[in-house]
Amino acid sequence: MNVLLIDVDQKFPNLALMKISAWHKKKGDAAGFNVNNPDKVYISTVFTWHKAKALGMANFYKSLGCEVEIGGSGIDLKKTLPDEIEHIMPDYSLYGIRYSIGFTSRGCIRNCPWCIVPKKEGSIRNHAPIDEFYVPRWRKLILYDNNFLASPKWYENLRELIARKIKVSFNQGLDIRLINQENARLLSKVHYYDDQFKDRRLYFSFDLLQIKDQMLKGIETLEKAGIPRSHLMFYVLVGFNTTYGEDLYRLNLLMKERVLPYVMPYNNRHDSYYPHLARWINRSVYNLVPWEEYKSGNSQEIIKELEVK
């Protein structure tokens, strides 16, 4: 059987497609992004703004007589892979990557109104052991757990990451409200990195002003455990239910605490304010130009130099 895989988003490696590829190749099928004369087509999109494009592709391949499967969070939050595909070693050669990706847990203990996880995955639970998706010779792992520190096996999994000296990126973010002396001590021994495996990085979020005190306590606890503030990055949701003033307050507080902020506009919002704010923060322009000066347009030469770099 010839199996064509289509990643509509093409923003980052699609884990579901890698598992589908592995399953079909195990059966002896030809599977990939450039398969001619397909008998079956899998189309996946994570983002809702690509839904129309994905549905258009599905209709096209159906008109050619192909069997078509379409899925992903952008299409159907409840659709999941069959267990025999979900729990297979992903085909990392599909994207030519040399790091592993996976979930040790699914779901979350929170119920944030902007997040699809509660609707998609429900309450937190164990999902898979690290060895199910980890390739030891690479020693690099990106964990997609939505709330790793709340998972039933967080302690065992941290101990395993430490013992095996795995370079890991918690790029979905850890919950700063759950930081305590015990997990901070273990995290200090983990080989944690950003998702490029270049800089030492632990990711958190500061989406709610109400968690300010817990956040400050968490930062202090991590620092006391030996984790430098420069290793901490906080995602900051903007454009959901906050004012401009509240957004700036949270960002300025993070800068004052000497940790790294990273702006995340809600649902990819493109109001003129949000792209400017994201550029000012995410490209570290704030280290050179105050916000008031930046938004007034009086720092365009500096901005152009940064964009060239």
Which role does the model predict for each range below?
Residues 1-70, 75-77:
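A short, structured N-terminal alpha-helical element that caps or precedes a catalytic domain
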Residues 13-14, 69, 77-80, 125, ...:
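Charged phosphate-binding loop/patch that engages nucleotide di/tri-phosphates or the phosphate backbone
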Residues 20, 53-61, 157-158, 183-187, ...:
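A general structural detector for well-ordered alpha-helical segments in enzyme core domains, enriched
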Residues 25-30, 60-70, 84, 162-169, ...:
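Structural alpha-beta junctions
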Residues 196-201, 210-309:
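A structural motif corresponding to the C-terminal lobe/cap of the Radical SAM core domain
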